[in-house]
UniProtKB/Swiss-Prot annotation:
This is Probable ATP-dependent RNA helicase DDX46. One of its GO terms (cellular component) is fibrillar center. It catalyses: ATP + H2O = ADP + phosphate + H(+). InterPro entries: DEAD/DEAH_box_helicase_dom, Helicase_ATP-bd, Helicase_C-like, P-loop_NTPase, PRP5/DDX46/KHDC4_KH, RNA-helicase_DEAD-box_CS, RNA_helicase_DEAD_Q_motif. A motif (DEAD box) lies at residues 529-532. It is found in: Nucleus speckle; Nucleus, Cajal body. A motif (Q motif) lies at residues 372-400. There is a cross-link at K186, K325, K779, K908, K916 (Glycyl lysine isopeptide (Lys-Gly) (interchain with G-Cter in SUMO2)). Component of the 17S U2 SnRNP complex of the spliceosome, a large ribonucleoprotein complex that removes introns from transcribed pre-mRNAs. The 17S U2 SnRNP complex (1) directly participates in early spliceosome assembly and (2) mediates recognition of the intron branch site during pre-mRNA splicing by promoting the selection of the pre-mRNA branch-site adenosine, the nucleophile for the first step of splicing. Within the 17S U2 SnRNP complex, DDX46 plays essential roles during assembly of pre-spliceosome and proofreading of the branch site. It comes from Mus musculus. Its EC number is 3.6.4.13.
């Protein structure tokens, strides 16, 4: 506006001037002109400030409208909208008038001014025009900003309109869905609609302008009440009640009404909004699947269903595969072709050669002749080059006979000492076996499976296998526990021809993702390394499950350094006509190991260990074996205090730490290792010179494996064993190992063993040598299930739990234990020798006793209580009947009744009166008789921990001292479902005593101990046998 008014004043002034006016102006005119210019500029600045302020206010109002539109009342929204429309109209009118004025003041008007102005005026006007141009530029920028603001406002209004349309469309769809889903509730809804209808009378908003209300109808619908939603909010409780009735209705009704009720609850049970008491307005509801409400019965049903599904899934893992329904593709096992050089050998030459190779013995028909070099076993050139590269010059004794036997397709049992090359003996035939078959396709499992008992052995076999697999293009995966399963699953899904595994984790892999990770349909070659320990450690069920899922015509190979006779029968179950190859006798220590056994006291062990370390540690690495994890950690601390850097290895360490410890020990980073028997197998360490058995091994096989860690691959090694006098029972196995390996037995060790045998013979005990672990895993049979059910029943009874489906649980715990005892009571009259245990009277007391006796006889005579009057009443009645007389009513004196009561009380108190002892003593050489009470309590059917509780030596001794009764354990344990043969009895406790009270006290104490153990089983019950450690 400033620019247009200024031009207008200039044009009117030019019209009023005379054409003959002089070119010069007076000073007053100039001053007035400058003042007008200053005032116009100040007015322009004020106008610009006002525009900027108004623009900021408009923007801030728009932001506030976006945030607070739903929270403000409708009246303020309408008034604000009216003010907004009026301001827009004013801005549009201003912009239109400004455009007309700017077009009327064109640049051509400046040329129509009089040409008789002075040059000074032209200069002044030139300066003013430059300022005016600058102002014009500013005004144009302001107009652009205004246009941009109007565009943004229009765009915002358009977006709001579209959003409202979407909301209305969504509301309509939700309304239709809700109406479709409440068909079954229509009758109840109609009844409640007649009682109470929704009305908008309590809406206190008055419409000021009906025309504006119609224009703003779209905005008002966003805030208006949805009658259906409001009604559903009010009948919320009725829907819940109907839902509860439908759930309780039964299976048939549940199937019909279940989906409908679920959908209604989805609409209703949303997050509860705070509803004003005066204004019951609808709330925008969204589907919230997580907010669905369930009754307690529905939740219980879901839990039961989930538990049943989980148990069914677990049972499915135990189901064997029906191989008759699977069509396996054929494969070839026999690849061995005997070279002419071996074919020419006679049987005598073969026997001589086997004798030279450390006395190879072979059992089984059709075993091929042993080879003498690698080229004779029929392997490829790639494998020969790998053998040469890694330093395998010629076959070891076990390899000379095992490789051709396996190449011929026969099952094998290989027995050889540690460090003899058993791994290569089954790897080379395996590579030939795999290369003969077609390559794996997507989704197929391995061709060869190697199972080991320990993770360390699995890693070592994998490392050995990868030396050859890379050149052959085969993939090897090591599957073992203690590490993340996701990486191993990823490797198996990519495919692998060879899997080296521990049995437990392999079963997890076969069951993962419903068997989609891997399978055993392509497996034709199975290896069990350290097979005896795998069965001893309780892996038998897992191994058998894996083997049973492999095709029956597979080739199975077993290798171990020890193979007890008890394992052979078990091994032959999964082998078909096996060949047994044994090298160097059964379980012997390598001749390269120098063995020393030291009989020493416990306190001197550590000092002797320090002496050995000072002598041998500079020459190589050292392993110290202990029996328990806590002993390993304790010895580690002692060695660290003695400035010996060392590490500890046992089963309680994480798998990652175990791997790093073994790598550091193999690399020579740490040369001293304290370990339990977990490192006794499969640990091949170069430059290992000394093995110290700090804790004496408890059986022969463990000693052989510990000593076998040193003296490998032809190197010299030393093995020292500490044994104390308390460990004399282990001396027999140590002596056996020394004798079989050709080592002299120390005299002090022989003396310790002979003293132990003499002591056992004196105690009447039979000496049995330990044959290794006898652990076993789950059998998953009916016997275990019956035992578990029986234990659960006892636990319920111990806790007083009652189940409507279990009648036995309601029986009292004492009655339950009493019934399981199946007790048998006996009372025997025992004749004792005449010698009395009462000491003979002294000379001083003899006269007093004689006087007392005479007085007693005189009193009996006076009261007519002689011997003849004390005849038994039944005897008198019998005599009367025999004589033909009549039986009179017996007369019992008060003294007789008193004596009978006194005898009962004395029997309960285990008290013998002095008068009776005197009478018995006075009878002299006559023999006396007494009663012995016996009771038998059968404990065979109680849980194992309860039997242990009452049959331990300490418990029996404590009960005997408390009750003064003798308790012995008799019979044999029979598992549930197995009945004893004729002449045998189930295990029971025999309680014996001279009086009945002692027997009752002993029985009550035994019952108390069993009851406490049954109650404790409620929280600590485990189906496995308890060991030293618990899994927390």
């Amino acid at each position: 506006m400033g620019r247009e008014s200024r031009h207008y004043r200039k044009r009117s002034a030019s019209r009023g001037r005379s054409g003959s006016r002089s070119r010069s102006r007076s000073p007053s005119d100039k001053r007035s002109k400058r003042g007008d210019d200053r005032r116009s500029r100040s007015r322009d600045r004020d106008r610009r400030r006002e525009r900027s302020r108004s623009r900021d206010k408009r923007r801030s109002r728009s932001r506030d409208r976006k945030r607070l539109r739903r929270s403000r009342s409708r009246e303020r929204d309408r008034s604000r909208e009216r003010r907004r429309s009026r301001s827009r109209d004013r801005r549009r009118s201003r912009s239109r008038s400004r455009g007309r004025r700017s077009r009327s003041s064109s640049p051509g008007s400046k040329t129509k001014k009089t040409e008789n102005r002075s040059r000074s005026k032209e200069k002044a006007e030139g300066g003013d025009s430059s300022k005016e141009k600058k102002k014009d530029k500013d005004d144009k920028e302001d107009e652009k900003e205004k246009d941009a603001g109007n565009f943004d406002q229009n765009k915002l209004e358009e977006e709001m309109r579209k959003r409202k349309e979407r909301v209305e469309k969504w509301r309509e769809e939700q309304r239709k869905k809700a109406m479709e889903n409440i068909g079954e509730l229509k009758k109840e809804i109609e009844e409640m609609k007649q009682g109470k209808k929704w009305s908008l009378e309590d809406d206190d908003d008055d419409e000021d302008d009906p025309a504006e209300a119609e224009k703003e109808g779209t905005e008002m619908e966003d805030e208006e009440l949805d009658p259906l939603d409001a009604y559903m909010e009010e009948v919320k409780e009725e829907v819940k009640k109907f839902n509860m009735r439908s759930v309780k209705g039964g299976a048939g009704n549940e199937k019909k009404s279940g989906p409908t009720v679920t959908k209604v609850v989805t609409v209703v049970t949303t997050k509860k909004a705070v509803v004003d008491a005066d204004k019951k307005k609808g709330e925008l509801m969204e589907n919230d699947q997580d907010a669905m409400e369930y009754s307690s019965e529905e939740e219980e049903v879901d839990l039961q269903t989930a538990l049943t599904g989980y148990q069914t899934k677990q049972r499915k893992l135990l189901e064997p595969v029906d191989h008759g329904k699977i069509e396996y593709e054929p494969f070839r096992k026999n690849f061995y072709v005997e070279v002419p050089e071996l074919a020419k050998m006679s049987q005598e030459e073969v026997n001589v050669f086997r004798l030279e190779m450390e006395g190879i013995t072979v059992k089984g028909k059709g075993c091929p002749k042993p080879i003498k070099s690698w080229v004779q076993c029929g392997i490829s050139m790639k494998i020969l080059n790998s053998l040469k590269k890694h330093g395998y010059e010629k076959p070891t004794p076990i390899q000379t006979q095992a490789i051709p036997a396996i190449m011929s397709g026969r099952d094998l049992i290989g027995i050889a000492k540690t460090g003899s090359g058993k791994t290569i003996a089954f790897l080379l035939p395996m590579f030939r076996h795999i290369m003969d078959q077609r390559s794996l396709e997507e989704g197929e499992g391995p061709i060869a499976v190697i199972m080991t008992p320990t993770r360390e052995l699995a890693l070592q076999i994998t490392k050995e296998c990868k030396k050859f697999s890379k050149t052959l293009g085969l993939r090897v995966v090591c599957v073992y526990g203690g590490t993340g399963i996701s990486e191993q699953i990823a490797e198996l899904k990519r495919g692998a021809e060879i899997i080296v595994c521990t049995p437990g984790r392999m079963i997890d892999m076969l069951a993962a993702n419903s068997g989609r990770v891997t399978n055993l349909r392509r497996v034709t070659y199975v290896v069990l390394d350290e097979a005896d320990r795998m069965f001893d450690m309780g892996f038998e069920p897992q191994v058998m499950r894996i083997v049973d899922n492999v095709r029956p015509d597979r080739q199975t190979v077993m290798f171990s350094a020890t193979f007890p006779r008890a394992m052979e029968a078990l091994a032959r179950r999964i082998l078909s006509k096996p060949i047994e190859v044994q090298v160097g006798g059964r379980s012997v220590v390598c001749s390269d190991v120098e063995q020393q056994v030291i009989v020493i006291e416990e306190e001197k062990k550590f000092l002797k260990l320090l002496e050995l370390l000072g002598h041998y540690q500079e020459s190589g690495s050292v392993i110290i074996f202990v029996d328990k994890q806590e002993h390993a950690d304790g010895l580690l601390k002692d060695l660290m205090r003695a400035s010996y850097p060392c590490m500890s290895l046992h089963g309680g360490i994480d798998q990652y730490d175990r791997d790093s410890i073994i790598n550091d020990f193999k690399n020579g980073t740490c040369k001293l290792l304290v370990a339990t028997s977990v490192a006794a197998r499969g640990l091949d360490v170069k430059h290992l010179i000394l093995v110290v058995n700090y804790s004496c091994p408890n059986h022969y096989e463990d000693y052989v494996h510990r000593a076998g860690r040193t003296g490998r691959a032809g190197n010299k090694g030393y093995a020292y064993t500490f044994i104390t006098e308390d460990q004399a029972r282990y001396a027999g196995d140590i002596i056996k190992a020394l004798e079989l390996s050709g080592t002299a037995v120390p005299p002090d060790l022989e003396k310790l063993w002979s003293d132990f045998k003499d002591q056992q013979k004196a105690e009447g005990k039979i000496i049995k040598k330990s044959s290794g672990f006898s652990g076993k895993g789950f059998k998953f049979d009916e016997t275990e299930q019956a035992l578990a059910n029986e234990r659960k029943k006892l636990q319920k009874a111990a806790l007083g739990l009652q189940d409507s489906d279990d009648e036995d649980a309601a029986v009292d715990i004492d009655e339950q234990i009493e019934s399981m005892f199946n007790s048998k009571k006996r009372v025997k009259d025992m004749a004792a020798p005449g010698t009395s245990s009462v000491p003979a009277p002294t000379a001083g007391n003899a006269e007093k006793l004689e006087i007392a006796k005479r007085l007693a006889l005189r009193i009996n005579a006076q009261k007519n209580l002689g011997i003849e009057s004390q005849v038994d009443v039944m005897q008198q009645a019998t005599n009367a009947i025999l004589r033909g007389g009549t039986i009179l009513a017996p007369t019992v004196s008060a003294k007789t009744i008193a004596e009978q009561l006194a005898e009962k009380i004395n029997a309960k108190l285990n008290y013998v009166p002095l008068e009776k002892q005197e009478e018995e003593r006075q009878e002299g050489g006559q023999s006396e008789s007494f009663k012995r009470y016996e009771e038998e309590l059968e404990i065979n059917d109680f849980p194992q921990t309860a039997r242990w509780k009452v049959t331990s030596k300490e418990a029996l001794q404590r009960i005997s001292e408390y009750s003064e009764a003798a308790i012995t354990i008799r019979g044999t344990y029979f598992p549930p479902g197995k009945e004893p043969k004729e002449g045998e009895r189930k295990i029971y406790l025999a309680i014996e005593s001279a009086n009945e009270l002692a027997v009752q006290k002993a029985k009550a104490e035994i019952t108390r101990l069993i009851k406490e153990e049954l109650i404790r089983l409620q929280n600590s019950y485990q189906p496995t046998n308890k060991g030293r450690y618990k899994v927390l």
